[in-house]
C-alpha cells in the first residue's frame, strides 16, 4: 500500500512539473546590476539576486516574462509602451536593461481617462491638443514621472493601438496602459481571447511598477465574455496575482490601483464583483484607486484609507464636445508626491493648471436656477467653499446634484439644437454629477462673494453682481405648454428650470383658496363634470358660487385650443393653493432642485360682482394671506395685484409680504397710477407694451424691480432682456430660457448609471 502511495505521489509531481520550464535572465541598468527586482510570468514569482540574475520555473504556456519595474528606473518606452515585459514563447533567457530616472521617493503620476478612439477624425483630435498639452506638462516635471491611460484606449477599432503608441511617446514620459472593455476583440469569445490583440500590442493585463516607496498595481477588472458583454469585477486569476505581488510590497508603501472600471458604481453605490476580496488582500495600506470607464469625474471614499478617483475622459464626450457629459472639461489628473505628501489636480486640456472651478450665474442651472452654482470637478470634502451675501457671512455652500449648463449648450450646438437626437445616443445625454455646490441668495441681494480654497491651499474669489440675470417666470405655470394653473403646469415649469412660478388665486363658496386665473370656468379650457364642454356664451359658472368638491370635478386640461397649439392636452383639475405649494415644495426636494420662487396674484377687483361672484377685497386678501403665510416662503414669495385697495390693505396688515403692483397697457401716466398707492412696492409689473427705457429708468430711480407681463414673442422677449428688466412673465418659458441660458432642455429623470 505504501509503495502504491509513493508511486501516486511521483506521478502527481511529474504531472505538476510537466507544464513548467526553467528560464534565466538578468535585470540591469547599464553596468549596474539590479538586485531584488521581482520577476514573474503572471503565476510564478522570483527576485533577482545582487548580481541582477534570476532563474525560476515558468508555465510552459506562459505568454510573458516580466518585471515589477523598481523605483528609480523605467524600461525603454520609445515604442509607446514601457518594455518591462518580453515574450516567453520559445525563449529560455531574458535580459531587461532599464533606464535610471533618479533616486528618492518623490515623483509625478498622470492618470488619463478614456481616449476611446474609433476613427481617423477622433485620432486627429487626440494627437493634437491633448497630446500637445501633456507634452508641455511633461517638460515641467522635475521628478521621475509616469502616466497611466485607464482603459478604452480604442473604441472597438483596435488597429488604432499602433497609432496611439506612436503618439503617446510625445508626452516625454512613460505611459502605462490599462485594459478597458472597448480594448477587447468585439467578437472574441471569453475573457482571455478577448484581450489577445491588446496583449500583443500592450503586454500583460496585470502588472505593477514602483514609484518612490509606493507601488502601482495595474489590474484588468473587465471580465469579458463576447460582443461587448462583460462584468466589472475581479477574476480569480487576478486576485491570485495580487496575492502573490503583495508578498513583495513593503508595509510602508502606499498603493495605487489602476483599473478601467470604477470600484464603486455611482450612483447606485454598489461595489463591483469580488471587490471585498481585493480589499481584503490590500488592506493595511493607504490605497488610491485610479479608474475611468464612466467618463465623469468623481472622488469617493470607499472605506478608511481607501479612496477612489474616477477620472473623466480625455475624449470629452466621445470627441463630440470639449466637456464630458457631467460638465468636466476634457483632461487628465496629475499627482505629485513630495516629502511624503501627495497632492493632485485635474488638468483641463488647453487650460492653465489653476483652471479648477466654473461659476454659473443664477438662471443657468436647470436644477438650481435661483442659485449661484460652482462646478468644482475635482471636488471632495477637503475643499473649503464659503459665500457672503452683501458682505454678510452665509457659511458653506451646499453640495448638490446638478447637470452642466455648459455641456448642454455644447450638445445643442453639436446636435444643431435637436436635443431629441440624443435619444438615439443616450449615453451622451447630460449626466448628473455630485461636484457642484450652490449658494441660494435672497432675490433682493445685490452682491454675492464666493471664496474657494482647494485642499492644497490654492484660492479663488468670485464677486457676483446679482442684477446680471433675468428671473424667468412661468405665467400660470407656462400656459402655452401645459394646462394653466395646474399641478402639471407647475411640475413642467420646475423641470424646465424656471426661477419663479406665477399663478392666480380665487376663493370658493366654502372659503377654500383655489388656484385659478378666471373667476369662473372659461370656455377655452373647461369641461363640466358631466362631460359637456363649457362654450363661449354659456352662463358663467363662478368659482365663488361653488364648493371646492364640485370645482374639482371640472376637467380643465383635456380641451384643445387653437390659440395654444403647443399646449399639452390632459385631464386635470384646479388645485387648492395649499395643495399646490405642498406639491411644489415636496417635488423640488424629491428631485434635488433648489427652492423655487412664487409670484402669486390675488384676483381682487372693483365692480358690481364684488361680494357676489368674488369676495370683497379685504376678505379675499385675508383668506389668501392666511394660507400663504402658513407656508413660510419668506422672500421667495411675491404677492401681486392690480387692485390698489388690496395692495394698500396688504401693506398695512401684512407688512411681511413682498408686493408687486400690476398695471395694464392703459395705465397711463406713471406718477398718476403710482399715486393710487400709499406706499412704494418692491416690484412694478407693467404690461410689456408700455415698457421702455424711460419706465425702466423711473423704476431704477425709485428702487423698484420690474417684471413685465405677459411676453411671448421672441423679439419682445429679447427687447425686455436688452432693457435689463429683473424678471419676465411668459406663457412660453422655454422660449425665454433659450434666450437667457441657451437651452430649454428639461432636467433629467431618475439617476441612471451610464458607462460606455
What are these regions (language model features)?
Residues 306-392, 429-443, 447-459:
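Binuclear metal-dependent phosphoesterase catalytic core
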Residues 74-75, 158-251, 272-290, 299-338:
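Extended active-site neighborhood of metal-dependent phosphoesterases/phosphodiesterases
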Residues 22, 29-30, 71-161:
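N-terminal active-site segment of His-dependent metallophosphoesterases
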Residues 404-438:
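Aromatic sugar-binding surface patches on proteins
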Residues 21-24, 28-43, 60-61:
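Short, ordered, surface-exposed loop/turn motifs in non-cytosolic proteins
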Residues 374, 464-756:
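Phosphate-group recognition and catalysis centered on beta-loop-alpha active-site segments
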Residues 60-75:
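A short, solvent-exposed beta-strand micro-motif common in secreted/extracellular proteins
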Residues 43-57:
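Short, acidic Ser/Thr/Gly-rich low-complexity loop/linker segments typical of extracellular
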